Amino acid sequence: MGQKVNPIGFRLAVNKDWRSKWYATGQDYATKLHEDLVMRKYIKEQLMSAAVSSIVIERAWNSVRITVHTARPGLVIGRKGEEIEKIRQYLQGLCGASTQVNIDIVEIRSPETDAQLIAENVAVQLERRVSFRRAMKRAVQVAMERGADGIRIRCAGRLGGADIARAEWYREGKVPLQTLRTPIDYGFAEARTLYGIIGVKCWVNKRDEVVSQQNSRPSGPRGPRRPRA
């Protein structure tokens, strides 16, 4: 089952965290969920060239805090903060005057090992008619050079303008999708080519986390066995 399910959702509360952090009931839940979708879509469209990996939304009773993880914080902030202020004002109008909107920027130190950015980079190259094999091999090589324990990239669609759609993938290193303690990063992007849409998926293994001794089973000797009746 670990081969099919979304790796991030599969590892929630283990070594991954939610990207929407708030509580609601009834009709209020649907309203806030729709607001989250609109805000994420608007930020991604406005910051299309800023290499945005993920957007985390936290809500309190009268405030919304949005954390944007990006590899190019300078493009997000803009000259004297003009770009980020324009985005904040739009989101403020969306949430209403009674809700305070704050935006934080977090820089991604190693974009070469970020699964979402890798998938988007491969998709951009496919739109520029770069060979899918060359794009995938280059992304895998760079990620392994930057310290990833393993990476897998999968492209599906009319690759190379073929009449019949197919899927091609490359993998290097270890990518254990069924091991929950392994922090697998996952990203997805779409390349809109002349022959149709090509889906790009990326899995990155960012090193096994050390399991704490409290959660591990004791390795001491077993006690004497109870004799059978």
UniProtKB/Swiss-Prot annotation:
GO terms for biological process: translation. Keywords: Ribonucleoprotein, Ribosomal protein, RNA-binding, rRNA-binding. Residues 39-109 form the KH type-2 domain. One of its GO terms (cellular component) is cytosolic small ribosomal subunit. The keyword S-adenosyl-L-methionine does not apply. PROSITE patterns: KH_TYPE_2 (PS50823), RIBOSOMAL_S3 (PS00548). InterPro entries: KH_dom, KH_dom-like_a/b, KH_dom_type_2, KH_sf_prok-type, Ribosomal_S3_C_sf, Ribosomal_uS3_bac-typ, Ribosomal_uS3_C, Ribosomal_uS3_CS. It comes from the Bacteria. Residues 210-229 are annotated as: Disordered. Pfam families: KH_2, Ribosomal_S3_C. GO terms for molecular function: mRNA binding; rRNA binding; structural constituent of ribosome. SMART domains: KH (SM00322). Gene3D superfamilies: 3.30.300.20, Ribosomal protein S3, C-terminal domain. Belongs to the universal ribosomal protein uS3 family. Part of the 30S ribosomal subunit. Forms a tight complex with proteins S10 and S14. Binds the lower part of the 30S subunit head. Binds mRNA in the 70S ribosome, positioning it for translation. HAMAP family: Ribosomal_uS3_B. This is Small ribosomal subunit protein uS3. It comes from Akkermansia muciniphila (strain ATCC BAA-835 / DSM 22959 / JCM 33894 / BCRC 81048 / CCUG 64013 / CIP 107961 / Muc).
